[in-house]
């Protein structure tokens, strides 16, 4: 009786927890994604990097530099001789100027620099998209994992209720002398095993909620419930997925952008072969005053302008070395793109195989779970009537529980594969 009371206590706690969860707000997957996108720290850091790249895109390479100078200097010279008293001669000097320097040609380097800044901005924006996709993938995976674990828990609750009913029935039959004490003890062992299993599964569900809440970064005290059903999208076509992956996969887009930056780096180095032409102009003012002489001063002022050209005719083959290295970097970026493309397309094929297999297995296991449920209902009735032993009933019970768990596992794997395919095809943020 003590074991029965213990199992009833466990069942009451779990049912109370289930009722509390039902009373909480249901958090949809879309709401969870929005919460994560708003609060995730890694995404905030990536967005700040994007703002830095935005600040770096300026017209500075095309614009002149303007500088201004000003100066005031006072000089005191003391003159003395044997025939006169010492005298102090003071001079005051004032000068000011403004200059403008403008590079008007540098082998088109300024245009390449600006274009490179824009490309780096595009890459930063692409990294934000990748971070968003990664976060959405994690949120979806954890969300559906909670659904699976909760369904595991529900099936464990059902199994515990059946084991409790079996034990009570076995105890009554034992008191009537219908069964032996050995069968009663076996029923008690199975009841205890199901009690332990349900407590372990309840801990698994709680841990899944904690991991999910950490991912949302919404505070561990956040209370919510989630939906209890996993729905697979209509079956996807592999040819369509291949085409979309090559065009829209964000990792491949980032690799293509990196290749373009390498090309621009090569263009910048090539610009070193050309002369640079600068235009400069300015205005200078200078005034020197002699206070000891009335109305005595010297003043100059005026404009200046001119052009200046610099051409590095020979640099000890440094320019040639830099161009050679830039070409190698460009080749490396092209090879890196091909490597990433090969890796991603290979992952696509593997995921699609897992996806199709997961759908097929899910259909099989769904049918098996329904058959197992029907068989369990029949077995329960036969057990109550005494035409089925406790050990035989336990086998039906385990078959039902295993069928439910296999169905949930297959459904979860198919859904995770579906999410992975949408990620590779660039569809996850649509």
Model-derived segments and spans:
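Bacterial N-terminal signal peptides that target proteins for export
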Residues: 1-9
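Periplasmic alpha-helical coiled-coil/stalk elements that build and connect Gram-negative outer-membrane
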Residues: 2, 134-246, 351-354, 358, ...
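Bacterial N-terminal signal peptides
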Residues: 9-18
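Bacterial Sec-pathway N-terminal export signals of envelope proteins
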Residues: 21-67, 220-260, 312, 341, ...
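Short flexible linkers and secondary-structure junctions
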Residues: 24-145, 277, 281, 317-320
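Sec/SRP-type N-terminal targeting helices
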Residues: 44-48, 61, 90, 104-132, ...
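Small/polar, glycine/serine/threonine/aspartate-rich low-complexity segments that form flexible
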Residues: 69-102, 226-234, 267, 280-311, ...
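Short segments within alpha-helical structural elements
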Residues: 193-220, 370-427
């Amino acid at each position: 009786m003590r074991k029965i009371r213990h199992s009833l206590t466990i069942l009451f706690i779990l049912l109370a927890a289930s009722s509390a969860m039902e009373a909480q707000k249901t958090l949809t997957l879309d709401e969870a994604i929005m919460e994560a996108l708003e609060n995730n720290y890694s995404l905030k850091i990536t967005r700040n990097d994007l703002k830095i790249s935005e600040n770096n895109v300026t017209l500075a390479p095309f614009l002149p530099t303007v500088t201004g100078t000003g100066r005031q200097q006072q000089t005191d010279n003391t003159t003395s001789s044997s025939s006169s008293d010492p005298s102090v001669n003071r001079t005051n000097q004032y000068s000011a100027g403004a200059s403008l320097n403008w590079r008007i040609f540098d082998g088109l380097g300024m245009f390449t620099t600006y274009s490179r800044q824009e490309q780096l901005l595009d890459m930063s924006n692409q990294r934000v998209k990748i971070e968003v996709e990664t976060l959405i993938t994690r949120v979806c995976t954890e969300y559906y994992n909670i659904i699976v674990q909760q369904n595991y828990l529900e099936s464990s609750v059902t199994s515990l209720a059946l084991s409790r009913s079996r034990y009570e029935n076995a105890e009554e039959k034992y008191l009537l002398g219908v069964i032996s004490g050995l069968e009663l003890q076996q029923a008690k062992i199975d009841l205890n095993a199901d009690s332990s299993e349900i407590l372990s599964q309840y801990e698994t569900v709680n841990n899944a909620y904690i991991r999910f809440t950490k991912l949302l970064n919404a505070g561990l005290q956040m209370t919510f419930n989630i939906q209890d059903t996993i729905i697979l999208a209509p079956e996807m076509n592999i040819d369509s997925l291949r085409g979309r992956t090559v065009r829209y996969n964000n990792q491949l887009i980032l690799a293509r952008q990196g290749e373009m930056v390498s090309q621009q780096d090569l263009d910048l180095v090539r610009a070193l072969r050309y002369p640079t032409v600068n235009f400069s102009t300015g205005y200078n003012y200078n005034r020197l005053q002699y206070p000891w002489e009335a109305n005595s001063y010297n003043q100059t002022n005026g404009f200046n302008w001119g052009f200046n050209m610099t051409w590095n005719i020979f640099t000890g083959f440094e320019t040639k070395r830099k161009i050679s290295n830039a070409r190698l970097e460009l080749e490396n970026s092209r090879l890196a793109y091909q490597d990433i493309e090969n890796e991603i397309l290979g992952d696509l094929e593997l995921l699609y195989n897992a996806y199709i297999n997961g759908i097929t297995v899910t259909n099989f296991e769904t049918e098996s779970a329904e058959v197992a449920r029907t068989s369990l209902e029949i077995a329960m009735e036969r057990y109550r009537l005494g035409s089925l032993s406790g050990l035989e009933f336990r086998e039906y019970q385990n078959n039902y529980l295993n069928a439910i768990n296999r169905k949930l596992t297959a459904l979860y794997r198919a859904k995770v594969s579906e999410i992975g395919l949408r990620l590779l095809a660039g569809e996850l943020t649509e």
